[in-house]
């Protein structure tokens, strides 16, 4: 792997856990409130076509909050990211949400 690719991945890997714990990303709200949408998706919503029933691929999904928000609006979403640590945080949030909904 090229050195710049390794450094870039390490940079995003290092950001994943702090971002997941940050109130700016509000991961805990996604688990607690099934209607919560990310700030990014709420901002984009007036500019987006109807997403219900559509399939979407979210590139650079990071910790998944925008991807989950689009899914909450009815899209079938797949999130991809360069950072394994970011994807692990996204999976963790979804697993916590599923556990809460199953309880």
Residue ranges and their predicted role:
Residues 1, 45, 59:
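Generic anion/oxyanion-binding catalytic loop in active/binding sites
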Residues 11-14, 43, 78:
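Catalytic cores of glycan-processing enzymes that make or break glycosidic bonds
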Residues 24-55, 69:
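Conserved alpha-helix/loop element of class I SAM-dependent methyltransferases that forms part
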Residues 51-103:
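Class I SAM-dependent methyltransferase SAM/SAH-binding core
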């Amino acid at each position: 792997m090229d050195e710049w690719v390794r450094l870039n991945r390490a940079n995003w890997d290092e950001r994943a856990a702090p971002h997941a714990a940050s109130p700016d990303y509000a991961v805990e709200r996604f688990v607690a409130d099934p209607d919560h949408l990310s700030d990014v998706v709420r901002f984009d919503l007036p500019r987006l076509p109807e997403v219900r029933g559509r399939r979407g691929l979210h590139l650079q999904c990071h910790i998944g909050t925008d991807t989950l928000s689009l899914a909450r609006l009815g899209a079938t979403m797949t999130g991809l990211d360069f950072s394994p640590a970011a994807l692990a945080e996204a999976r963790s949030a979804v697993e916590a949400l599923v556990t809460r909904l199953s309880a």
